[in-house]
Each structure stands twice: as C-alpha cells, then as structure tokens.
C-alpha cells in the first residue's frame, strides 16, 4: 500500500469507518457439545426458574473472588451467590450481590419452546478444545492448560408471551479455568428476538422493541461491570454478526481479575492499540475479522454512538410520572415531584402509611389522614408488635400441655390421648392386682368389681391375712371347748375369740356387792347401789344406764329400778362382759362357701364344684378343656359351661369373627363400610387415606404473576391471599384461594394491569399511554404537562440531533442541520461520497457528513484536483513523516522531535527514580529535561507502566509543572516497567513524544497477617504460617526474624515459599523472644525493593526448666518428702505445682513460692504406688508459663512396716526397709574384716534398700563405712567396732539371680520375668509389677508411648494477698485466683510394640 493510502485508512478507522462483519453466526456444529446424550442436565420448565445451586468441583475465579457454586437461570444468565429471577434486564452496574455472567439476559420462557442444558466437564476432549481456544484468543498465555469446563446452552428458547410458533434463540456460555485464570466464551447461533411481551419489558408480539437483552458481566458491587456492545438496544438482534476473536457470533473474555479483559488481535493487527478511538471511557474491542480490521466500542452507562461520543438523554423517554420534572445527568436522571407524589419517578402517591411501620407482616391501611395496621393472625397492637398468647384460654384437654405459635397453638398430648385439643382417647384402668394385694402367697384374680384372692392352705380372709386355727390357741388361761373348734372359755377378766382382750376394771366390777340385791351403777368416778327397797323421794334420780354398764358394745335398757344389757353377737353376761366367739367370723369356708352356725358348731355350704368340711376339695372343671376360642372366658354352671366372648366375637364357643368394621378402623370420624373380608372408609371432609388417617394437604400453591401471596397453611380450609402489585387489579371478585377437600386449590385469581387511560385524562387531543400503576399523556404538537394542559416550546425537548439547532414554531419545530446531516431531527448522516467528488482516481472515504479523498501518488487537493505533491521536497526531513493535504503538507514527527517540520528536539526527563514502594502503588520522581528551551517545548509527561508479564498496561498524563507521580491500583509483589515520556500536544490530536526514561521496579508483596506458635519448650520455639494461593502468588521466599533477649541485633533466616514452618533451637529457658515474618518476591539480589512490611511482632516466652535432681529423701506410710535443686540463677520463679497421681486420680497443689526447694506430700495411703511430679511456674506479662514436669515414682510403706519404694525418672524401683534391732546382737562380723570387737556391740538399727535389679544397699547406724564384696568362699571374719558416734556403714550386696536352684518361686516373685522392652520386675506380696523404662507403659511394658503436642488451655490457680484493716491492725488475706492460659499440651499416644513390629515386618 502506498504511503498516502495507508494514512487515509488509519484516519478512516479513527473516524469510526471500517466495515462490520458480514451477517454470520456460529454453527451448532461449532458449539461446545451439549444435550442429554452428552450427559447434560436440564432446568425445569418454569417461568423465571433455574437449576438451583450447582456445587462446583473446583473454585471458579470471577472478578477477583473464587466461587464454589453457581446457578443456571432460565432467563439467559449464569449467576453466583444467589439465583436471579428478574426477567427484565437491568443496566449494569448492579449491586446487591447480582454477580452474573450474561450471554443474553432477557425474559426467556422455556415452557413454550426450547430447553436449557448444563453440565460440568473435565474429560480430555473438552479440556483440549478449551485449551486450544484460549491459547488462540489470548496469545499472551501460550502455556495455558484448561483443567475444568462448564457449558450452559439455551437451545431454541422463546420469549415470555410467545408460543410454540414464535421466534426462537440459540446461544451458549462456556466457563473455562486452570485454577488461576478464568475465561468465558459466548457462542450465538441465531438471535431472532430480544424482548418479552411483559409490560415491564415492552416487547411486541415478535419479541422485538422495548428493553432489549443485556449481555456482559457484573461484579455485583455496583461499580465493576462490562457490556457487550449493543446491550439493551435493538443492536442485540445482530449480536451473532459481531465478534472480538475473528469468528462472527463468538466473543471471548478473561474474567478472573478485577477487570474484564477481552481477547482478540495481536499488536500488529490491532486497530484499538493504534488509534484508541473510543471516547468517554469506552472500551475498544478489536473485531479482528481476517483481512478487514475494525473495532467496536463498549460504552460506559450513559453514553452511546459508534465512538461513545453521544450522551444518552435519559429524560427523552419521559420517565417522570404524575407531572414530575425530569433533570438529565450523565448516565442518570432525577425527578422533581409535585406535591402529593414521591418515588424515583414520582410514581407513588404520598400516603399516611409512608411513615407507618407495621411489624410481623402487618399491612398498613390508610384511613383519611391516619394510618392503621391490619395485623396478621396471632398479632395485635398499634404496630402489630404483640404476639397473641393463644394458650391463655387453656385449650388443651386431658392434661395436655399447650405450645404458643404465631396465630395458633399446638397441644402436646399425654398417652393415650390425641387430637388437636387432646380430646380423643380414654384412660386405661389398671388392673387391681397390680398392687399385689393378696398376702401370704395368695393368688390375685381380676373380678368385675375388684379382685378375689385365692388363699394358700392355712390362710383365709379377703386378702389371705388370717391364719386358719387347727389347734386350740386360747390365750390368757382360756380353755378350748371341743376338738377342731375355735371356741375358748375365758377366765374372769378376759374375753374375745381367743380370750385376747382384758376386761377393763370399773368401780362396779371390782367385787362390789350392793345389799338387798341392788345393782351397782357407776356415778361420777364412784358407784351407786340402786336398792330394791321403796324410798319416798321428791327429786328425780339418775338413770341406771347413766353409768354405761354394758360392755363390748352392748346397749343398756333402763327400767324403774334396774337395767338390762342387750349384748351384741358374740358376747353374753349381765353386762355383756363374757365373749361368745362367732364361729363363722374367722371365715373358715373356702372357695366361696357359706358358713352357718348351729349351737356351738358351724357348717359350710359349698358352691358348685367344691366339697369338704371347709369346701377345700375341688370337683372336675368343665372349662378345663378350654372350649372358648378367640380369647373367650369360660364360666361354670351345674354340669355346664358358658363362654363370655370378647367384643366383636359371638357363637357358643366365640368362633364367629367380628365384622371388619367392628373395631372402628376409620379415623377422624370416617364411616366404615363392611366389604366382607375387608373394609372401606368414607372420610370426613379434610381427611384422606385408607383409614382417613391423613389430613388433606394441597401443597404449596403456584405463584400468580404480578401478585404477592400470603399463606396460612396447606391443609383443607387453608387460605392463600393474593395482593396485586401496584398498577394491577384482580380479574375476579375473590382475592383468595381455598384448599378444597379434594386436595387441590381453588382457581387462582389473575392480576390484570389497570388501564388508567379509561378516564381519558389527556387534554387537547393528547393520546393516553397506559403504564404500570400510572399513565402518560402523549401530547399533541404544541402542548405539554401531565395532562397536556400547557402549551409547550417544542425545542425544550432538544429534538435536533447531531448538533442541529432548533427553531420553535406554533405546534411544531424546524431543525437546522449541520453539514453532513439531514432529516426532521438531523438524524440521517449524508453520504458525502455519493457524488463521487474525488478526481484522478482518488478514493472517497465518508466520515460524519464530510468526505476525504485519498489521492494517488502525484495528486493532492481536497478532491485530488492538484497534480503536485507538497511532500516531494521532504520538508519533514528524516525527523518525521510528511502528509500532503490541499496543496500543503503536515509532518508527523518521529520519537524525540516536534514542531511544524519536526525541527525541534524533544528531550526525555532525567534522573528518574523510585521514591517509595507500597503493595498497591509506587511513587516516582524525575527532573525536567536539561535546558530552558527543552523545558519550554514540552506540555507535560506521559507516564506508562506495565506489568512485566504484559497482563496490564496504563498511561497517565502529568502536567509539566509536576515532576513526581503516584502509580496506583498495582498488584502486590509484581514487577513493573515504568517509562516517562516528554509530551508535546498538537492541534490535530496527534501528540509528539520523546524517548522514554525507563526503570524497572517491583511492588511490595503482601505480608503474612496470621502465623502461630505450634510448640514451645525450654530451649525451642516452633512457628507456622500459610501463604494464600492468590494473595501471595508472587512471594518467592519468607524471612523469619528473631530478636533474642537483651540483644539489639535481629537474627534472620530466609526459607523457600514451599516451607511453612520453622523451629528455633538452642534458646534460653524462661526468656521472651520476638518473632517477625517478612515476605520476599522477585529474584534474590535484585536492586529494587522486594520485601513486604514486617508483620506485627509475636512475643513468645520459652518454658522454664523443670526442677533438677528431683529425689525423695524420706518416704513413710502416709507422706513423702521431695527435694530438688534451686532454679537457674537469673530466673525468677513464681510458684511450683505439685501433682500426686494414682491409678485412679490426680490431685494438684499450687505452692506460691518460687524459691521452694523441698516439699512434703502428705495424706498418702499406705502401701500404694504414686507418681509425684513437680512443675516450675514462671510469671510473664502473657500469663503463667509452666515447665515440663519432673517425675518421681514412689511406693509408700505399709502400716505394719516401714518399707518404701520410689524411682526417679527412668531409674529402677527402690524399696527402703527399716529393720528394728534384734533383741540381742553381741557381735556383727563383716566377711572381709579381721579381728573381733573388743567390746560387745550394741544393737544397731539398719536399713536396706532394694532397687529392683537384684541389688541391696544396707545402712547401719553407729558403724564405720566399710565395703563388702561377695565372694565364692568366705574370708576370715572381720569384727565390727562399736562406737558411740552416729557413724554409718554401707554394705553393697549383690543378690543371686532368680534362677538359682535354691530360690523359691512365689506368686509375687520375679521368677518368671514377663516385663518387656527393658522393664524391671518388682516383686510384690501377691503379684509382681513391671517398672517400665521411659517411653513404655502397660502391665508388662508392652506399649510404646509418645507425646504429641497440641494447643490447649490450662486453668492455673494463683494465690494473691490483699491487705485488710481490722481495727487498727493491717494484715493480709490470701485469695486463690484462677486464670486460663493458652498453652501447648501433650497428648500421649500408645501402640503395642508387638503390633508395631508386625507392621514393620510386613512392610
């Protein structure tokens, strides 16, 4: 191409010229494979529905965040975070977590036509195809390899309001990732509709017009988004003809970063990189159709046009309702509402309910100038704030407990009651025999009115309480009358059946004799003799019965001068004082026999089937053969029987079965129908099931579009109330649906849009347009206002486009169009090349109403009419490129030059340097070019900074008055190439630049915010950290720094990023250390900063040393005295913790004395084995630090002896025996000494120590220390000298091994040593035990144990003193305070050594 023609082509591209792709689309064969045969799932055929949450096998990065699940929505989008049922697309950006990938967001209705398929794919064929596509469309990522693909396909779907014959669309979304980068590919096969017919979308019957589909990406934060060109405009019908990757109908994007990046051309074929034609922040997208380079501008919201150069007038659609005034802004509008209206578009009339908040679902109802809350069932109060307690009326019966619910209650019934109010059921009467009323081994039998006791031989009575008397048991000297009878003749003063009762002494029965045969009468504690002799008295005498002379319940009958006693049955005598036993009172007749007395005898009349004196002999039982079936009860008659059948059965032997309906199998009032061997239940309304056991449940009713539903349940009689959205009214009289007895809901209502135009509100022949919850008047020319009541200036609406000027006329206007535009509104761009103005073969290029002739070589001029080339003389020299135009030339200067003919040198800035480096920014500075002339030439500086991998690039312009700049929004830990150019701005929008001043720097990596200490000992600290896969992706090394105590020099260690833990050893015990972490990025030794800010220091204390040389100096039956070395100089301890452990429990004692070097443990049990441990406690500002415990094992002495055992650490057990002196010890000889003592020795006391290894040490009091050696033959005896000084002698005796022939094996001996792993056998009284080496446990030391560290919390007690005044004396009160301290605990894990050895041998 010739030079002039090349520049013309570039100029044409800058003006927005250049061919778009021809009508094409991606064939279905070029889609990623889909369909049920490929294993795809299909979304439900539901309006505005979707797939529900689909968990992902790998996280998917999107806008800088990772997502583990997604939703495939029927309306053409894939959403994260939550499902999106919005069917009318909303302009991006959108907040409220609307995180979406939109291939074609519109009102899809797959119920009418089409399917929505989706699947997650990781097979090799899909991954290979995705890898090839991404490497082709993003050549800067040649090493990309896909590991996961998700495919969603909307196949032949139609729009809401369409039918099976309406136009259909097919498009596809493909998500691809390798775990780090993520991409989206959109494939469009046919796009025949863009809009649904719902009123909010505004589409026509063909699915066109109104608010068209939205395509692009939205981060959900209200800020970040990306639109595919044509979104929400009629151009979406042509989306299958556009592309950014050279394939019409296919778009590819990278979407893992904070901003969407488009795929496309290389640097050599990119129009966007050369011209940058998009204005007002628009995103330039190369179309990259092979052989025809072109571009498309993705405009920010609020701008439109080929180059995003036109500001969208949001007021043109008259969004403000009810007379509101619209004010236009950039990508926005605002409405100034008239009085009585409110809302973003003045759509809502102000109501008293605007400031009334009804709680708990209450609905506000305006009444004149006030507002009232209509509460939901179960709530009351002015704002429905009070929950009604439905349990206050005690609705639950039969002991049921009531649970208050919202608008209802529930009864929890006790068995056997049930029902909504526990009203159904009855108590089961317990058997009277459950209390075992029969005594003395009697058998209880249930009866109709109670129970009957069958008594064993020798007992009788209702509960077998009375014993049958076979012999005479008369008491108090009574005499038995007759054989085998119970009649006793009692001596004077006693009465009763067995003469068991003593007659009470009274004044009249103590041998008192009245003269003349008079009778005695008690009177006032004395007696009175009533004589037979007549006496004349004038006053009344007391009655003879006043003294109550009759005993034992006898009744007194008074006569004139005497009385008689009428005795009760069983007594006789004048005063009823003599007992006559009732022979039948003892119940001698058994088995229901009737007792009758005859004189001094009784006779038993026996019932059927019994005989004998006492009816004790049974007759044959006719019921013994069990003739009654089905649980019938057999009753005896004289020679006969009768069956008492259970309910439902009949017949002589209860052999006839009841009807299937007998037991009332139908529940809840159902009517039972007998079907012979089966039954059928006719249920009451509201119940269903074979036995009417289930309530009718209609399920969840379907939603009604444009309506809000309130539901009080799904059982029969439940009601679903529907409230139409504003602007809609019910199509039927009822606004509710009722759950019917058949288990289905009644017919739903429909919300039909209200036609507010029926009242003809528009004046002056204005036409009314119905809106949702309102209307809009389209006024006739010359009128305006809410109701077209005002005459208007037609030019106020700015009807003239493309810079045309408006002239107002009565009821009309005229647009005076600028050159290049025609039409009523100057809307049509004139094809300036239609008249072929270019001469001499010049090529005409149209642009914005004007034309440009690209002249062949040798011609120039506006129409190529001049045959001369102003550039022939090379006016620009070698410093620029010459371009001829209209007989003149212009120079495009090369880098480093400027001026009309590029004669001035444009010098770069000097002394470029980095001032400060942060995680997301870099501050740089420079010096202006040297020389006054060089400084005056430039207009400013261009600062270009790009990441070293080429993933991002930005250029900022800096005024020439400044010499520093802050680069922002950089990625942490990345290397950036920074170039600063001197810039000279020209009038033709072509800028001249100098050579760059460049440098390479790297931002700081992100620090490690969280790291932890995993283990602490007396001389080591272990720390652990974690690097985030994305946030620390640029970190190459980690520096761990430690500041030692009393040292100002920080010691550091650097480790590779693969290392996540480090242990510092050789530390001092009980000291504080400060640990810091710093991340490093970039190669080592780089000259620019590569390290992050240091993390906050973590102060850690090492543990103090455990007490050293812990020993037991004295062990008794109930105590043990321990001693240990003082702590290391320079370490100040606060306390010690003494733990006493047995096989059953552990007791801990806190001793608040850090200088303690000994302690006596008391209250021990004799002859028991104990583990004693001592832990040192050091106090720090972080709390208390505990050392590892020092252990000591002891065995206390038995009470009848003073033997003691202990062992220290891993040493063998020792046993200390204190032996009393023998009664007489005249002489003690040692085997290796000579001579005899001069004087008889006194009885010495000695102690011997058995250490469990067949060695004995003995200590003698009052003897010199001499060694004893065991020899095969004894040597000459050596006498021991007896001295008065308390000197001691030690004898070390080597005991023979247990396998000696003369060793007797006892149950507690160690003759058979079963201790494993080096354990030492310790003999005992009844059995031996094993003293295990450290690291082993078990009865035979068969378990290998290790301590595993883990973080834990410890509860420590601390004794503090508080000064208290009492009177004039100050003293201290000690109080124990408990603290919780974070610590590292050790959990012991044991494993059998035999099992461990077996595993090692198997490996």
UniProtKB/Swiss-Prot annotation:
Any one Gene Ontology cellular component term annotated for this protein: extracellular region
Pfam families xref list: EGF, fn3, hEGF, NIDO
Cellular localisation: Secreted, Extracellular space, Extracellular matrix
Tissue specificity of this protein: Expressed in liver.
Glycosites: 292, 408, 484, 536, 712, 886, 977, 1015, 1109, 1139, 1298
Biased composition (Polar residues): 1305-1314
Start and end residues of each stretch annotated as Disordered: 1295-1314
Domain Fibronectin type-III: 908-1006, 1007-1105, 1106-1200
Modification(s) after translation: Phosphorylated on serine and threonine residues. N-glycosylated.
All copies of domain NIDO, residue ranges: 103-258
Main location per the UniProt record: secreted
Single GO molecular function: Notch binding
Gene3D superfamilies reported for this sequence: Immunoglobulins, Laminin
Key words, A-Z: Calcium, Disulfide bond, EGF-like domain, Extracellular matrix, Glycoprotein, Phosphoprotein, Repeat, Secreted, Signal, Sushi
Residue pairs linked by disulfide bridges in the UniProt entry: 272-284, 278-297, 299-308, 315-326, 320-335, 337-346, 353-364, 358-373, 375-384, 391-402, 396-411, 413-422, 433-444, 438-453, 455-464, 472-480, 474-488, 490-499, 545-556, 550-565, 567-576, 584-595, 589-604, 606-615, 623-634, 628-643, 645-654, 661-672, 666-681, 683-692, 698-739, 724-751, 757-768, 762-777, 779-788, 795-806, 800-815, 817-826, 833-844, 838-853, 855-864, 871-882, 876-891, 893-902, 1310-1321, 1315-1330, 1332-1341
Protein name: Sushi, nidogen and EGF-like domain-containing protein 1
CDD domains with a match to the protein in the record: CCP, EGF_CA, FN3
């Amino acid at each position: 191409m010739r030079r002039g023609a090349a520049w013309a082509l570039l100029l044409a591209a800058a003006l927005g010229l250049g061919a778009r792709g021809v009508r094409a689309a991606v064939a279905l064969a070029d889609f990623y494979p889909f369909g049920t045969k490929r294993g795809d799932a299909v979304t439900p055929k539901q309006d505005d529905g979707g797939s529900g949450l689909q968990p992902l096998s790998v996280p998917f990065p999107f806008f800088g965040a990772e997502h583990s699940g997604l939703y495939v929505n029927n309306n053409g989008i894939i959403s994260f975070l939550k499902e999106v049922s919005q069917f009318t697309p909303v302009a991006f950006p959108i907040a409220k977590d609307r995180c979406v990938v939109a291939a074609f967001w519109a009102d899809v209705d797959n119920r009418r036509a089409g399917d929505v398929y989706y699947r997650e794919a990781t097979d090799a064929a899909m991954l290979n195809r995705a890898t090839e596509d991404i490497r082709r469309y993003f050549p800067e990522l040649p090493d990309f390899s896909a590991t996961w693909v998700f495919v969603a396909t909307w196949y032949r779907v139609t729009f809401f309001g369409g039918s099976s014959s309406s136009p259909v669309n097919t498009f596809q979304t493909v998500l691809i990732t390798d775990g780090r980068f993520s991409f989206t590919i959109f494939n469009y096969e046919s796009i025949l509709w863009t809009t649904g017919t719902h009123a909010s979308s505004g589409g026509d019957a063909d699915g066109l017009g109104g608010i068209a589909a939205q395509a692009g990406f939205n981060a959900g934060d209200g800020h970040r988004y990306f639109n595919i060109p044509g979104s929400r405009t009629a151009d979406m019908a042509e989306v299958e003809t556009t592309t950014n990757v050279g394939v019409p109908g296919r778009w590819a994007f990278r979407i893992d970063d904070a901003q969407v990046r488009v795929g496309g051309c290389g640097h050599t074929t990119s129009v966007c990189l050369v011209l940058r034609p998009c204005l007002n922040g628009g995103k330039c997208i190369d179309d990259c159709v092979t052989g025809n380079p072109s571009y498309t501008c993705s405009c920010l919201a609020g701008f439109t046009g080929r180059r995003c150069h036109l500001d969208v007038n949001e007021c043109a659609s008259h969004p403000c309702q009810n007379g509101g005034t619209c004010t236009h802004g950039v990508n926005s509008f605002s409405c100034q509402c008239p009085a009585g209206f409110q809302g973003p578009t003045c759509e809502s009339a102000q109501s008293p309910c605007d400031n009334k908040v009804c709680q708990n679902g209450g609905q506000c109802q305006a009444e004149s100038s006030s507002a009232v809350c209509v509460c939901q069932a179960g709530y009351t109060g002015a704002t429905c704030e009070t929950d009604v307690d439905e349990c206050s009326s005690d609705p639950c019966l039969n002991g049921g407990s009531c649970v208050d619910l919202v608008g209802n209650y529930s009864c929890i019934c006790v068995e056997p009651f049930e029902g909504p109010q526990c009203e159904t059921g009855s108590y089961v009467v317990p058997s009277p025999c459950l209390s075992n009323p029969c005594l003395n081994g009697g058998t209880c039998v249930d009866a109709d009115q109670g129970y009957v006791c069958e008594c064993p031989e020798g007992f009788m009575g209702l509960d077998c309480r009375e014993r049958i008397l076979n012999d005479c048991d008369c008491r108090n000297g009574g005499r038995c009358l007759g054989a085998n009878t119970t009649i006793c003749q009692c001596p004077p003063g006693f009465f009763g059946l067995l003469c068991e009762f003593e007659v009470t002494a009274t004044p009249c029965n103590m041998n008192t004799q009245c003269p003349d045969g008079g009778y005695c009468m008690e009177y006032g504690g004395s007696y009175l003799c009533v004589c037979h002799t007549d006496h004349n008295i004038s006053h009344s005498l007391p009655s003879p019965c006043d003294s109550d002379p009759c005993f034992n319940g006898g009744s007194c009958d008074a006569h004139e001068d005497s009385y008689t006693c009428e005795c009760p049955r069983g007594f006789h005598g004048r005063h009823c004082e003599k007992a006559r036993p009732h022979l039948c009172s003892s119940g001698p007749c058994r088995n229901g026999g009737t007792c009758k007395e005859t004189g001094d005898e009784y006779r038993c009349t026996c019932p059927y089937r019994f005989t004998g004196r006492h009816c004790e002999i049974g007759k044959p039982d006719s019921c013994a053969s069990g003739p009654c079936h089905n649980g019938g009860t057999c009753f005896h008659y004289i020679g006969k029987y009768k069956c008492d059948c259970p309910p439902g059965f009949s017949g002589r032997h209860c052999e006839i079965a009841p009807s299937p309906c007998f037991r009332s199998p139908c529940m809840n009032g159902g009517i039972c129908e007998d079907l012979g061997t089966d039954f059928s239940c006719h249920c009451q309304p509201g119940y269903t099931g074979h036995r009417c056991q289930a309530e009718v449940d209609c399920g969840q009713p379907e939603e009604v579009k444009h309506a809000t539903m309130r539901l009080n349940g799904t059982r029969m009689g439940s009601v679903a109330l529907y409230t139409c959205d504003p602007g809609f009214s019910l199509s039927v009289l009822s606004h509710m649906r009722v759950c019917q007895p058949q288990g289905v809901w009644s017919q739903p209502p429909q919300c039909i849009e209200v036609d507010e135009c029926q009242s003809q509100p528009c004046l002056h022949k204005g036409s009314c347009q119905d809106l949702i919850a309102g209307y809009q008047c389209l006024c006739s020319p010359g009128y305006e206002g809410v109701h077209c009541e005002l005459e208007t200036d037609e030019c106020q609406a700015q009807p003239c486009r493309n810079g045309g000027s408006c002239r107002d006329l009565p009821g009309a206007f005229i647009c005076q169009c600028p050159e290049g535009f025609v039409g009523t509104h100057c809307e049509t761009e004139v094809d300036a090349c239609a008249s072929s103005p270019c001469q001499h073969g010049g090529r005409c290029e149209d642009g914005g109403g004007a034309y440009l002739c690209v002249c062949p070589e040798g011609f120039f001029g506006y129409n190529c009419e001049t045959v001369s080339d102003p550039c022939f003389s090379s006016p620009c020299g070698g410093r620029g490129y010459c371009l001829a135009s209209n007989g003149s030339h212009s120079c495009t200067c090369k880098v480093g030059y400027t001026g009309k003919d590029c004669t001035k040198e444009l010098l770069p800035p000097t002394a470029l340097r980095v001032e400060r480096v942060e995680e997301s920014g870099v501050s740089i500075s420079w010096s202006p070019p040297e020389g006054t002339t060089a400084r005056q030439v430039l207009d400013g500086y261009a600062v270009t900074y790009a990441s070293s991998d080429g993933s991002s690039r930005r250029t900022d312009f800096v005024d020439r008055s400044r010499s520093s700049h802050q680069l922002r929004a950089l990625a942490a830990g990345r290397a950036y190439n920074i170039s600063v150019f001197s810039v000279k701005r020209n009038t033709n929008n072509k800028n001249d630049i100098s050579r760059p001043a460049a440098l390479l720097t790297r931002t700081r990596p992100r620090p490690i915010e969280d790291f932890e200490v995993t283990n602490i000992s007396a001389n080591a600290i272990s720390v652990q950290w974690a690097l985030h896969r994305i946030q620390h992706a640029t970190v190459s090394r980690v520096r761990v720094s430690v500041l030692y105590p009393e040292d100002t020099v920080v010691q550091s260690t650097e480790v590779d990023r693969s290392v996540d833990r480090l242990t510092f050893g050789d530390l001092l015990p009980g000291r504080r250390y400060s640990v810091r972490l710093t991340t490093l990025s970039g190669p080592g030794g780089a000259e620019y900063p590569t390290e992050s800010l240091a993390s906050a220091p973590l102060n850690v204390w090492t543990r103090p040393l455990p007490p050293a040389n812990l020993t037991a100096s004295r062990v008794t039956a109930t105590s043990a005295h321990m001693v240990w070395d003082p702590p290391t100089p320079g370490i100040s301890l606060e306390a010690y913790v003494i733990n006493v452990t047995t096989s059953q429990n552990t007791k801990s004692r806190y001793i608040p004395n850090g200088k303690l070097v000994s302690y006596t443990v008391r209250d021990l049990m004799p002859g028991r084995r104990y583990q004693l441990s001592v832990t040192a406690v050091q106090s720090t500002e972080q709390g208390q630090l505990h050392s590892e415990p020092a252990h000591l094992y002891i065995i206390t002495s038995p009470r009848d002896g003073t033997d003691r055992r202990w062992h220290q650490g891993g040493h063998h057990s020792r046993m200390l025996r204190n032996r009393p002196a023998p009664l007489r010890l005249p002489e003690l000889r040692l085997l290796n000494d000579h001579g005899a003592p001069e004087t008889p020795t006194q009885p010495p006391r000695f102690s011997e120590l058995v250490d469990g290894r067949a060695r004995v040490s003995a200590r003698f009091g009052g003897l010199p220390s001499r060694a004893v050696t065991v020899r095969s033959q004894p040597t000459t005896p050596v006498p021991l000298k007896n001295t008065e000084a308390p000197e001691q002698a030690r004898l070390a005796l080597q005991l023979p091994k247990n396998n000696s022939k003369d060793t007797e094996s006892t149950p507690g001996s160690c003759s058979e040593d079963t201790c494993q792993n080096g354990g030492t056998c310790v003999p005992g009284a009844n059995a031996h035990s094993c003293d295990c080496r450290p690291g082993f446990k078990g009865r035979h030391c068969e378990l290998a144990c290790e301590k595993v560290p883990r973080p834990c919390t410890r509860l420590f007690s601390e004794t503090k003193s508080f000064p208290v005044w009492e009177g004039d004396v100050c003293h201290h009160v000690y109080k124990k305070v408990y603290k919780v301290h974070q610590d590292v605990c050790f959990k012991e894990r044991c494993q059998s050594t035999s099992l461990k050895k077996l595993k090692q041998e198997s490996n």
